[in-house]
Amino acid sequence: MAIDSKPHDDLQLFKTNLHPCGYWPDRWASDLVMDPNDPRLGAIYPQALAWGFRRSGNLLYRPHCEHCNACVPVRVNVNAFVPNRSQRRCLARNATLVTRIVPAERNAEQLSLYRRYLHQRHPDGGMDGHGAIEFDQFLIGPWGYGRFMEIREPATNGTPGQLLAVAVTDLTHQALSAVYTFYEPNAAARGLGTLAILHQIHWAQREQRPYLYLGYWIKDHFKMDYKRRFQKLEIYDGYRWRPFSTTYPTTHTL
């Protein structure tokens, strides 16, 4: 299938073939993908986030399954966000850690942490063999929006502390998008995944961006249901963004 949009063409969307669902082992999935050869894709990306799309490398996609609508786009209204008790404890527990924003350029330390994270947290998940090429293809976008938010132990004698987490984040003129976070698997007690989102929310507030996109919430899924804890949360119902509800129906309509 040839796909090659021109600057004045209508935006083209393509539906993928069925593939194993990445969340439910007994289901098949398909996605809508924007034409990856469209030269306007970088400019479209900020609006695509508001349409419920996500970035993986240079692909913009959205789940589009015939018999399942469990993947619900969600975003945090950062100006209305209030951390709950558990999140406040997470911040206090990690108050000595250092956070910094760096260019989205892979280095050996980040790659080592990424591979260790995948090996221990997602064994046999299809990504645990990732190396430098896969890291770049998956995480580093081509349009200049990407940043790496590093979370480290405090420096010692001028030497940077241990790298504990990297939150791959896209910073657009409208919002932040949490692309992927990987962290030290042997530091589970710190709640580094939660900490990363809390710091991304603070980052969005500093940059005066009203939203942090968290991708897809899946009700009762052991890996995806946690996103409901970051309130005030909004869901995309296929037409517009609404206040979060665990019972609100969703559609596939663009």
Swiss-Prot record:
Q: List UniProt keywords, sorted A-Z.
A: Acyltransferase, Cytoplasm, Transferase
The UniProt record lists the EC number as 2.3.2.29
Q: What InterPro entries does the record tag this protein with? A: Acyl_CoA_acyltransferase, Asp_Glu_LeuTrfase, N-end_Aminoacyl_Trfase, N-end_Aminoacyl_Trfase_C, N-end_Aminoacyl_Trfase_N
Q: Which Pfam families does this UniProt record tie to the protein?
A: ATE_C, ATE_N
Its localization reads: Cytoplasm
UniProt catalytic activity: N-terminal L-glutamyl-[protein] + L-leucyl-tRNA(Leu) = N-terminal L-leucyl-L-glutamyl-[protein] + tRNA(Leu) + H(+); N-terminal L-aspartyl-[protein] + L-leucyl-tRNA(Leu) = N-terminal L-leucyl-L-aspartyl-[protein] + tRNA(Leu) + H(+)
Q: Which GO terms describe its cellular component?
A: cytoplasm
Domain of life of the organism encoding this protein: Bacteria
User: Is Isomerase among the key words of this record?
Assistant: no
One GO MF term attached to the UniProt entry: arginyl-tRNA--protein transferase activity
Among the GO biological process terms of this entry, one is:
ubiquitin-dependent protein catabolic process via the N-end rule pathway
EC class of the enzyme, as a word: transferase
Q: Which family does it belong to?
A: Belongs to the R-transferase family. Bpt subfamily.
- Role of this protein: Functions in the N-end rule pathway of protein degradation where it conjugates Leu from its aminoacyl-tRNA to the N-termini of proteins containing an N-terminal aspartate or glutamate.
Question: Matching HAMAP family, A to Z?
Answer: Bpt (MF_00689)
Q: What is this protein called?
A: Aspartate/glutamate leucyltransferase
Which organism was this protein described from?
Answer: Xylella fastidiosa (strain 9a5c)
What is the organism lineage in this UniProt record? Bacteria, Pseudomonadati, Pseudomonadota, Gammaproteobacteria, Lysobacterales
Q: Which gene encodes it?
A: bpt
